[in-house]
A protein has these predicted regions:
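Long, contiguous binding/interaction regions
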Residues: 1-89, 96-195
Length: 195
């Protein structure tokens, strides 16, 4: 997948004047083509060039960064999140409003997260790989970067759509599964796997 370049970034004033339109379009795109919910408190947002373009534009808008060298440094960081061929890259997001741990509602904590906790279930189980693996990454905030490496067989299952595909997360007493991935989302992920 092509990396973001400085020429792709709108000047701050241009982006600001169209931000509402971009934001609404971005949210619709995420919800329909890029987001998977696991229960009520966890989401996966699969990143690609389009999602990261908006994210970077927002960072530049909020920080008022306009220096091309600084902008390029930011692009270099975010370009690492653009998936390579045969890879799905996602943000793993834990809702900060998640209710506290109770016996009937075991809470999930990022401190308990390991790559094999989260799996893509096709006709086989594919564990995720943590992009952020340091202990301090796992103890801060409500988000992680993860990726899935798919072989040709798994890619064809995503494309074909006849075999169910979903995500499953288990840790200690916590278990959450997504619904079967809808066609639009599978097609969007298939595009990621080709680039």
């Amino acid at each position: 997948m092509q990396k973001l370049e400085l020429k792709d970034i709108l000047p701050l004033d241009d982006f600001e004047s169209q931000r509402k339109k971009f934001f609404e379009s971005h949210i619709r795109y995420i919800e329909k083509y890029r987001k998977v919910r696991l229960g009520s408190s966890i989401s996966l947002v699969f990143e690609n060039r389009q999602t990261l373009w908006f994210r970077v534009q927002e960072i530049f808008r909020l920080t008022k960064i306009a220096d091309p060298k600084v902008m390029q440094n930011e692009l270099n960081v975010y370009n690492r999140l653009i998936p390579e061929a045969n890879t799905l890259q996602a943000a793993f997001l834990l809702d900060p409003q998640t209710p506290p741990h109770t016996v009937n509602n075991p809470a999930f904590s990022l401190k308990d997260f390991r790559g094999d906790n989260l799996r893509l279930i096709l006709n086989k189980s594919i564990p995720c790989d943590l992009t952020t693996k340091r202990p301090e990454d796992l103890s801060l905030g409500n988000a992680l970067w993860i990726r899935f490496f798919l072989d040709e067989e798994a890619k064809m299952i995503i494309k074909d759509g006849r075999t169910p595909a979903k995500f499953s997360l288990s840790s200690n007493q916590f278990l959450a599964e997504s619904h079967n991935l809808p066609t639009e989302l599978r097609e969007s992920l298939w595009e990621d796997l080709q680039k």
